[in-house]
Amino acid sequence: LGQNRGKEYPREITRTMIEKFSEMGTLPSVIYMEGGGADDKVCYDMCNEKDIKVMQWNCGDFWPEFMHENYPDKDYKEMPMVKNIYNPDEVHYFGDFTHKDALSVLKKIHGERIRWGLRGGMVDFTELVPIDTKFDNGLMGNRMHNFWVWWYAKAYHDLYTEMTGGDYLCYMRGACAGSQKWNCTWTGDQMNSFDGLKQQIVGGLSLSASGFSIWGTDMGGLSEKPEDEVYIRAYQFCTFMPIMRTGGDATKLPWDYGEKVQEVFKKFYWLRENLLDMIYSYAIYSHKTGIPMTQAMALAFPECKEAAGNEEQYVFCDNILFASVFEKADTKNVYFPAGRWYSLFNDEVIE
């Protein structure tokens, strides 16, 4: 839940975040580092001391300067970089993850940080492969546009599996058939508004119905600070997602918002903590069976005509009915399929 995107004073930012979360009694399981903190071992040490995992931003670029520095005896033709169809000496920055040496490059880029305690993170920019390129597996860019994501995801899976024994989490914004075997997904850059939240529930349920069960969002939007009410509804929404995480350029730290936000943050933080065993167990079940962690109403209740087309409710982990409030309102009409429903927050029962 924590964010540290600061390029300056990363140690001070990390220390302050840990102290303030501790004061609230809501210590996060992960702090996301981007900027100076991602390369500072002291920041990792502070997190490790509190048993907080560190994640970072990743992209698929292999920079020529880095490649020449680390592979001085090789020319571009031999490097795991995407080549121009007409001139193999002309390379794009995109890593060629079909190449046998791609994993060794990732180890050089990320290996030291993984040894410090890095445990995955965002794997970004998965949809930009140029058409006029050729890969080591012989396929051209027009055929690899989607499939590159599969190789990209597998490369990071192989990297972290080998170096951490499987104790990691990576999530991508791109996907293709089969890439969910290697990584999770997040629904991409979103607006910091109620409309942005509505887009995420549609995107997440579409992902789930397509076989991508484990997903999350940039809580509260990518850019600029959301209004307090949007933050609250986004946080409640994320509580009932497979992956609960913050993200984006603007702060999502609760103390940067009003008192009501902080109270809601604490309440739903502990609700999530108490649901974790169920969520973890159902994630394993979902991975083995293909049954989504978030089921659209039509999928969960195919016999109910009233459920069809309902895009603002879903069933989470097979037994929690979640109904979003994605507008400035305190109440919402909720459709309850036949059965007995118990409130999570009081002793109310609906039949």
Which ranges hold each PLM region?
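Catalytic-domain carbohydrate-binding cleft regions of carbohydrate-active enzymes
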Residues: 1-351
